[in-house]
Amino acid sequence: MLYFIGLGLSIKHLTLEAIDALRDVEKIYVDTYTNIVPDFSLDKLVSLVGEEKEFVMAKREFLEGKNIHFIVEEASKKNIAILVPGDPFIATTHDAIRVEALRRGIKVKVINGLSIYSLAPSRTGLQAYKFGKTVTLVYPEYFKPYSTIETIYDNLDRNLHTLLLLDLKIEENKAMTIPEAVDILIDLDERGVLENIIGVGLAQLGSSMEKIVADRLADLKNYTYPPPPHSIIIVAKPHPIELDNLHYVCGLPEHIYRRYSVSKTYP
């Protein structure tokens, strides 16, 4: 049997169902390349699920390409788990393994975990149904990511917030920070609207070092944050309740809160 198990954004997010399954399997592949879980360590995992099994700290090459068939073959003979940061199939990274296992007639069980998609609206008080398409901002090494800006513009035109995931290149030990992202966004902003729009900086969301800051997007770079993972929410025109949450929950400065409490225009 093959388990796909969500780790959440902290090792403390593992559910009882997840821990029970991890205790029962013979081998655990720990996905180490799709996200950073700040408080995760193999020692902590072993203390929760026991050491009488094989642990593999899996880089990209372990879980993609030709190795998919190896993992599926293993799962045909014994119980295997792939432990994934966040929720296993919010992104499509491991879909090929699931499809191949099912094609071979191998049982697959998914145990869900907490994801930034649920935590971001919950922690900030922004309404989940007012989020548009999520997009990733990558480092502009070979090209400028104008498609990211176009997605943000499309969402704003429909009065929808944008959850902006920031580039992670874990195997290169490189992770984009909120200040870096702000500089890139303002450089790409041909409309000149993003600088003064409300942004929410999310650092280590869901961990004990979590930091959430709301301010003008341009001013998010002036705060100190714990190390990545970082994300940003580009806020469309907020509902009055959302505006209250941005102020009282996320620390939106008083002068911005008061301005948009009475203003009919945004930003």
Swiss-Prot record:
The keyword Amino-acid biosynthesis does not apply. SUPFAM superfamilies: Tetrapyrrole methylase. InterPro entries: 4pyrrol_Mease, 4pyrrol_Methylase_sf, 4pyrrole_Mease_sub1, 4pyrrole_Mease_sub2, Dphthn_synthase. Transmembrane segments: none annotated. GO terms for biological process: methylation; protein histidyl modification to diphthamide. Pathway: Protein modification; peptidyl-diphthamide biosynthesis. S-adenosyl-L-methionine binds at L9, D87, I90, S115, I116, L166, L205, H230. One of its GO terms (molecular function) is diphthine synthase activity. Pfam families: TP_methylase (PF00590). Its EC number is 2.1.1.98. It catalyses: 2-[(3S)-amino-3-carboxypropyl]-L-histidyl-[translation elongation factor 2] + 3 S-adenosyl-L-methionine = diphthine-[translation elongation factor 2] + 3 S-adenosyl-L-homocysteine + 3 H(+). Keywords: Methyltransferase, S-adenosyl-L-methionine, Transferase. Belongs to the diphthine synthase family. S-adenosyl-L-methionine-dependent methyltransferase that catalyzes the trimethylation of the amino group of the modified target histidine residue in translation elongation factor 2 (EF-2), to form an intermediate called diphthine. The three successive methylation reactions represent the second step of diphthamide biosynthesis. Homodimer. This is Diphthine synthase.
